[in-house]
């Protein structure tokens, strides 16, 4: 029986498949100390509920002298992960901030990775406890530098799409423009960092130096009408208008997540939500059919094309949670690869503190299993090498294309389990 020790926050609700629409808050009422099990591919996965919470100080300064900005992604270095004699766990956690401060527009924020010491002492009781089970301490900041040793930037990528011998990369002011979103760790200590601007994946050394680039399939590269005059990876308002950008990753919905399979042989990359050609109306509820690529990195860490390209259907929900029809797709924020054909994915609404609207309830925040068994592999077809759509928004995938199967597993919205750690699901409440 396999326990998901890689997950730091655990709670559960298990149903066969995603419903077409979650029209009211999707909550889990499993009591503390009660575990649940899901079987996938002959393995049992056990969810022991929410067993730990930690608080990280907001006044920490990183190695570049900036206030600490994370976590767009975080991954445990499995070479360091240990269970200690007292039942606690410890290891090294690497975290990735995105494009920096979002208070006065985009800035020249250099991409970086934060190395942290992690200690985790699970609390398996039903008692109300303080938020002290998980502790993190910053050890060092790894600045990502390009092939010439200069830092990257986070401003809008309006520059050329070729730099230092690499094509189809986002640039600005002669620098690589990176909005870091996904992180994976190779056995040799090097990293994969995915970029939301370009839907690109960078391979960087353990010290942060770029070693190579994985450019995405053509289907994920932005495409604009010829009359618009736009090209490249710009996210300017005129370029991303409906009817102007006709294909490729949607702005601010690029390569959100990457991870390596446990054996290190395959890299999975997942767009945050649907491409523009798969949702031509560019409405929020039509962003449900996203794209997954699988790369064989066993011999070459930066292959030129994927061995797998699949459609993954995200859940949809009523943003107000009042029983209405779907008006949003639950975009994904992270994946954990389990095998070349299965992974975990975190899909969620955008409701909650910091969303700018605390009047809406929390509706959907769930970690699910995804299996590629039976799904249509589109690698090498015009769906991947061109802009042939796989879907038309909410109307479903095209005939002959089978999306990956999704099974909910860990429902983060468990009021009872959250409350015992002092977390209030009332989005307007202090500490929620």
For each predicted feature, which ranges?
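Gram-negative bacterial Sec-dependent N-terminal signal peptides
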Residues: 1-20
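Sequence/structural signature of beta-propeller domains
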Residues: 19-432
């Amino acid at each position: 029986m396999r326990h998901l020790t890689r997950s730091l926050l655990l709670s559960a609700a298990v149903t066969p498949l995603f419903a077409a629409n979650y029209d009211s808050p999707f909550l889990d009422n499993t009591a503390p100390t009660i575990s649940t099990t899901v079987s996938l591919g002959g393995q049992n996965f056990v969810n022991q509920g929410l067993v730990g919470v930690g608080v990280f100080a907001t006044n920490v300064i990183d190695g570049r002298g900036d206030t600490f900005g994370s976590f767009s992604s975080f991954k445990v270095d499995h070479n360091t992960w240990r269970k200690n004699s007292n039942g606690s766990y410890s290891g090294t956690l690497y975290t990735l901030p995105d494009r920096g401060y979002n208070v006065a527009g985009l800035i020249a924020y250099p991409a970086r990775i934060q190395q942290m010491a992690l200690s985790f002492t699970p609390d398996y009781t039903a008692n109300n406890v303080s938020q002290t089970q998980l502790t993190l301490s910053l050890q060092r900041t790894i600045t990502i530098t390009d092939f010439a040793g200069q830092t990257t930037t986070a401003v809008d990528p309006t520059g050329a799409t070729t730099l230092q011998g690499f094509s189809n990369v986002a640039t600005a002011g002669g620098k690589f423009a990176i909005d870091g979103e996904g992180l994976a760790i190779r056995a040799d200590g090097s990293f994969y960092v995915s970029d939301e601007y370009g839907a690109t994946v960078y391979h960087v050394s353990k010290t942060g130096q770029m070693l190579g680039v994985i450019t995405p399939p053509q289907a994920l590269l932005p495409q604009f009408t010829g009359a618009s005059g736009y090209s490249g990876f710009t996210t300017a308002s005129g370029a991303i208008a409906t009817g102007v950008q006709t294909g490729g990753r949607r702005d601010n919905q690029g390569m959100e997540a990457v991870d390596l399979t446990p054996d290190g042989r395959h890299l999975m990359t997942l767009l945050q939500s649907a491409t523009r050609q798969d949702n031509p109306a560019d409405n929020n509820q039509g962003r449900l059919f996203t794209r997954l690529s699988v790369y064989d990195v066993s011999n070459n860490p930066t292959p030129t094309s994927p061995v797998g390209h699949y459609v993954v259907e995200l859940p949809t929900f009523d943003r107000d949670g009042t029983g209405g029809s779907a008006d949003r797709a639950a975009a994904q924020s992270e994946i954990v690869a389990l095998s070349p054909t299965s992974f975990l994915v975190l899909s969620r609404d955008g409701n909650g503190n910091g969303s700018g609207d605390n009047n809406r309830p929390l509706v959907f925040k769930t970690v699910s299993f995804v299996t590629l068994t039976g799904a249509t592999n589109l690698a090498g077809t015009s769906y991947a090498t061109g802009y042939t759509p796989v879907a038309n928004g909410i109307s479903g995938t095209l005939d002959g294309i089978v999306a990956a199967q999704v099974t909910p597993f860990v429902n983060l919205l468990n009021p009872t389990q959250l409350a015992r750690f002092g977390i209030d699901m009332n989005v307007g409440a202090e500490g929620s």
